[in-house]
Design a protein with these regions (language model features):
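PLP-dependent enzyme catalytic core of the Aspartate aminotransferase-like
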Residues: 85, 89, 174, 354, ...
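Conserved glycine-rich beta-strand-loop-beta hairpin in the small C-terminal domain of fold type I
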Residues: 294, 298, 314-325, 336-350
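Active-site PLP attachment segment
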Residues: 240-277, 289, 384
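N-terminal small-domain helix-loop-helix segment of the aminotransferase-like
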Residues: 3-105, 112, 300-303, 411-414
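Structural signature of PLP-dependent enzymes
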Residues: 278-285, 301-325, 357
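Conserved core of the PLP fold type I
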Residues: 63-210, 226-227, 233-241, 245, ...
Length: 414
């Protein structure tokens, strides 16, 4: 058979989470027999049930007439109105409904948006460049690759407080022989996956100023904007910055704050011309979101029940995060420099006895049944670290610590 997939689609890697899930499944029976049934700290997905209010609203919508037909790919009016209100109430951002487009999850939105703005070519010198954080969400680089572009890393390190020096990035890009005129967009993600780090409003102002100066689009992935522990670290929207709407689009998700990752619903908002052009692209790719999901999402977004659920969920994550940091430092002697202020992620250095993060994760899985993700899956600046997702129960976290201590997985173990 002739080669079917083009150079871009044919060269993408399997998503790291699927690789880990597959390996864990292969070892499950063996681990369970020896009292080490797998405990996953790998997937970035809440394991709690969504709010009852949301489930009830969905059931109610299922019986409404007209709910089972095609929906508007831009989003039904009731959803767009709810998003408009949410952006104003949560961030103080004035958005018109024609500056919003619904998404089948923010992952789909970002992938299709990149497909729309990148001009694909196999000529390395001519490829459009997207600036991305490093470490960052593992799919960003592959999304760009499959769209026919190339990514360029903006290092997030403890030294720069996970807010890269943009002028330094720009200078390094040119030192590396790349053409700055080919930079199409900058993609940022705060609070950050995998680090759990947030940025300041002042930094967002610098980002907007930088993008305007160099005439590049700002894409802000705000999937974790409602997952934070303290009011002083409450995440901002990039659209709060004066003039940001001139060259910014921001992606939001219902998945994380309401524990509805499988529902696949989110939105993008920002510059009207850009969002409307993207909506045209979307209309050729999909037929929108199932209406009952939109109806329920619209109801939860600005409800007392929804806000109370977010507060409760964040308090639960904070309890687990506090336990995790205390147990790993005091019982397992770990050195933790980065203590997250948001999300359900922890970012740990790999014990010195291991050559790399993959070796450590494999040993931990095979001996203790504990599943973590190698940091270099999120970029070259993730080398030497692992990402831990504390979405399991507190009791399971306690079992993780017990197993690791019993099996010799302390930070300074020989």
């Amino acid at each position: 058979m002739k080669k079917l997939f083009n150079e871009f689609a044919g060269n993408i890697d399997t998503y790291i989470m699927f690789k880990i899930k597959e390996k864990t499944a292969q070892l499950k029976d063996e681990l369970t027999k020896k009292g080490r049934a797998p405990i996953s700290l790998s997937m970035g997905a809440p394991t709690t049930m969504p709010p009852k209010f949301l489930l009830d609203a969905t059931k109610e919508a299922l019986d409404e007439k007209g709910m089972h037909t095609y929906s508007n790919p831009k989003g039904e009016k009731y959803l767009l109105d709810a998003i408009q209100t949410r952006m104003k109430n949560r961030f103080g951002v004035d958005i018109e409904t024609n500056e919003i487009c619904s998404l089948i999850g923010s992952k789909e939105g970002i992938a299709n948006f990149l497909r729309g703005i990148i001009s694909p070519t196999t000529n390395e010198q001519e490829k459009d460049i997207i600036l991305i954080p490093d470490p960052s969400y593992a799919s960003y680089g592959e999304m760009i690759k499959v769209s026919g572009g190339k990514s360029y890393s903006m290092p997030l390190t403890h030294k720069n407080n996970y807010m890269p020096d943009l002028d330094e990035v720009w200078a390094n890009l040119q030192k590396d022989g790349l053409n700055p005129d080919k930079v199409k967009a900058m993609l940022i993600n705060y609070p950050n996956n995998p680090l759990g780090a947030s940025c300041t409003f002042e930094y967002l102002q610098k980002v907007v100023e930088f993008c305007k100066k160099h005439d590049i689009l700002l894409m802000s992935d705000a999937a974790y904007a409602d997952m934070y522990f303290e009011e002083e670290y409450k995440p901002h929207s990039a659209l709060e910055v004066e003039g940001a709407k001139d060259m910014t689009v921001e992606f939001h998700s219902f998945s994380k704050p309401y524990a509805m990752t499988g529902w696949r619903i989110g939105w993008v908002c920002g510059n009207k011309e850009i969002v409307q052009q993207f909506a045209k692209l979307k209309s050729t790719i999909d037929s929108g979101i199932f209406k009952p999901l939109q109806k329920a999402a619209a109801k939860i977004l600005n409800s007392k029940e929804g806000d109370e659920y977010i507060v409760w969920a964040n308090q639960e994550i904070k309890k687990k995060a506090d336990y995790f940091v205390k147990a790993f430092t005091e019982e397992l002697n770990w050195e933790i420099k980065n203590v997250p202020t948001a999300t359900f992620y922890q970012w740990l250095p790999v014990p010195k006895k291991y050559a790399n993060a993959t070796d450590f994760c494999n040993a931990l899985l095979e001996k203790s049944g504990v599943v973590m993700v190698p940091g270099d899956a999120f970029g070259k600046y993730g080398a030497g670290f692992v990402r831990v997702s504390i979405v399991c129960s507190l009791e399971e976290l306690q079992e993780v610590v017990r197993r690791m201590k019993e099996d010799g997985f302390t930070y300074n173990a020989d």
